[in-house]
């Protein structure tokens, strides 16, 4: 890089302090910045002088020198810079650098020269060494000139160094690629501009002022007040040219001298603009000495370097610029010199010198410590059309383009951190998702209420939120779209992270929609006629012009000194060369592109391998144990939570009930005269009104009638109402306090359960954690990473689900195993229990069988003993009651074959035995005795009555010698009930069979009446038992059918003979008639139903057979109305057996007995006539039924074999069953009961 500060002119630079003191301080702090922006600190800021000469106003100071010339030149709008965005620059910085570049690039060129760039870069205040390093980095093609991207890069590096950064030793690859791409794009677009005119050969902005003009044209800069001199000062002479027109440089106030400063020549040919802040290099490489420009006591002023003067010019004499008596030194200018110009200072009024007093508005002094001289006025040439002659000059900017970009403040703080701020894609994705969440209507606009509520959650104060809203709501619509909302959220996060909020929204944060809208607005504001040629080429509309001549890289160092050749002058060879050059360039670009692609592909493959390895490592990591709460604990927690709510609801209801109960209790304790009709008996307003009306009515009635009525007055009602209201308020206050206590308890329980709920169901604040949103939800990550996270979570979820399923399956299997084990244990216990019960049942059954056997054995023994005892008693009674005739016949009746029989054997027993010959004996004995009418004497009958009373007494229960266990005692009742049921069934079945047998016997007897049983056969032994059951004649029925004879003793039957007792012959009448008073009384009692026996018994043996009627053959056999009261049931005599021709016997059907006839008392009247015998069925007469004398003991007929004809059903039996309540008593007489003693009853009247 060409560096003029490293040449031999260093001493002048160092003494001057240009690079360190003069320029650096002028640029960075006071001199230069204050010279252009405000007045220097060394001058006295006095008010502008006012002049009274005419109506003209004083001229204001204007910018002078090179800056003025650059400002007048403007921007190079012909330069075509492609539309390309540099990522390392903000949009605002790139626009500023483009403006500066356009102002410095010469017309027709696309690059900025090193000399022009040096002047720009030196204003930064950096050292030449630093600037040299920056130039080396920016000049990528080593052309000595910079294109716009290279110039922008240089400005960016300068800005970084000013902000404290280091100069990089090499450019970043990304920055380098962007700059190279931008440079290539510019190179392809070169040649689109038209060539410059033929005669234009400008190289610098100053050439237009020095070339093409012989002499400088006069320029009016103001009015001169009338003075004694009145001649303006000549400001320049040309070589061989007419003097320059006088130039007015200011107004002169009237003085006592009345003459102004004379005109002096101040320069040679083409005097250039004076630099007031810097020096231009002289052609010889040396600088001019300082020119004395001050008055008395004033220091030298730096007025700038002057352009190179042509050789041969006459030297200009120096001009006095100070006060009176002070001679200014001549300023050497090399070969030629210029006369110093009057630029200010206090001028002494002197006619000899002709000095001109300065304007009062000019700075008039220097402060101590200032190294910069007085501020010079503009002395250069200004375009004559800039202002009117009567208007004052306006202050102009003195820098290139926008002068404020070069101020220290601009370089130091003109690039705030917010300029580089922009929204990242991750932030956009996150903020857009939040916007879509709240934009439920899908309108694309978020209302200010919703957006303000979202912003308020950040915790910023109101002023900051208002400032953020003003920044993001660019169009003041009160609503935010997606981009504006994202900008607002971005500013909120930056403020939370400690960054300051910008005063204006940076261009990088301006939403694209707002930028487009603003551009459209600006285009609409500008008319179509004033539109300029577009400064950028649209990439879509770009079309390469191959006919244009493009500069090569080798001639970029050169400038176009000659006009470009016309298209017509191009030859075919030149075009071929251009085509070949383009082809080579394309090939090189392709090769470089392929190399870059290969390198990028290798890097991508390596990156992918690394990513795959990381993914594999992540997948291979052991999964975190699922710390989920067991399902039973979770279910328990849920149940407790729900039960707590239920409990609180119940408590609230109970509290309400308690409150109502208290109110009701108060009303009961303090009864009111007002009857409430509201809910729960509450007193309503209507009830109160009604009570008041009632009280008023009662008071009026009392006043009318004069009688007091005891009714509560209105005051009493109000007092009661007030008391009730106070009590109700008190009760409600207590209820409210209780409710508050319950609410506190509920809140405490909620606080305790909240951590548990968070642990079970996860945290509810996880969405506020950016890391959670990033790595759990995948917000702000690349799509591949998001997919990987999603798949990883799915894998973890599946693994957890499988683990939970396995755990549940194991728990289910364990539960089933426990259930099976429990079932097996229960089954085993049940089997053991059943076995034990069966064993107990068998033991009980065996014990019961043994007990039954023992009981039967004991009962049999007792029965035998009782039968023997009864037999003995009967024998004894018969023996005592035997008549002398019987004693006389006793030896005759004795059978020689039975010598061992005692006197107790009676004919009655023989008759009974004879009657039972044909009945098979089953070993059953029927206890009982004869009837009362069987005894003739009173003593025998009294003995009979005593015997029957003794028999009626219950026998002592048999004592069991075996101790029963508790279980036998428990089953005793059940066993007895079962036995009773079985006995009833057997009884019904036996009765049914007996009825069937009776029916069959009656049928057989009616069919074969010829065969009858002869009474003579009773003494004989039966040949064989008959298949047809033969019912024996009951002694009771026999006694009922027999009437006592008058004039004879007790009837006596001889079983072996029938000669005297034939039923077919008339019986002999006794001479005397006996009447038994007791027998008649007994008969009468039986007829009247006064007997104690009811004919029912629980004995199965006695009640199993139906009572059969006794067949009678004579009228004398009148049956009794009932059986003996001591007997369980009257035993009917069996029908008379009829012997058939085939040897079988038929039973005669029973004959209905006639009603009993009372016997008259003993008298000597005629005997009672006996009716003839009743006719038998089918014209046959049954044989006479033998009369059996009553005996003391009558054996019960044996059970006959039952005929089973297949009908086992006993439900249709019409036989009355014994009630279950009637239980048989063990030990009682199962056969007969004794008749109690009967008091003496007078005999009935005799029969007619």
From Swiss-Prot:
Residues 126-161, 426-449, 460-495 form the EF-hand domain. It is found in: Cell membrane; Endosome membrane; Cytoplasm, Cytoskeleton, Actin patch. SUPFAM superfamilies: EF-hand. Keywords: Actin-binding, Calcium, Cell membrane, Coiled coil, Cytoplasm, Cytoskeleton, Endocytosis, Endosome, Membrane, Metal-binding, Repeat. Residues 93-182, 427-516 form the EH domain. One of its GO terms (biological process) is positive regulation of Arp2/3 complex-mediated actin nucleation. Residues 559-575, 818-833, 869-888, 1078-1091 have a biased composition (Basic and acidic residues). Residues 566-601, 713-746, 787-879, 965-997 form a coiled coil. Ca(2+) binds at residues 473, 475, 477, 479, 484. Residues 313-337, 548-575, 800-1248 are annotated as: Disordered. Residues 800-817, 834-868, 904-915 have a biased composition (Low complexity). The keyword Cell membrane applies. Belongs to the PAN1 family. Component of the PAN1 actin cytoskeleton-regulatory complex required for the internalization of endosomes during actin-coupled endocytosis. The complex links the site of endocytosis to the cell membrane-associated actin cytoskeleton. Mediates uptake of external molecules and vacuolar degradation of plasma membrane proteins. Plays a role in the proper organization of the cell membrane-associated actin cytoskeleton and promotes its destabilization. Component of the PAN1 actin cytoskeleton-regulatory complex. This is Actin cytoskeleton-regulatory complex protein PAN1. It comes from Eremothecium gossypii (strain ATCC 10895 / CBS 109.51 / FGSC 9923 / NRRL Y-1056) (Yeast). The lineage of its organism: Eukaryota, Fungi, Dikarya, Ascomycota, Saccharomycotina.
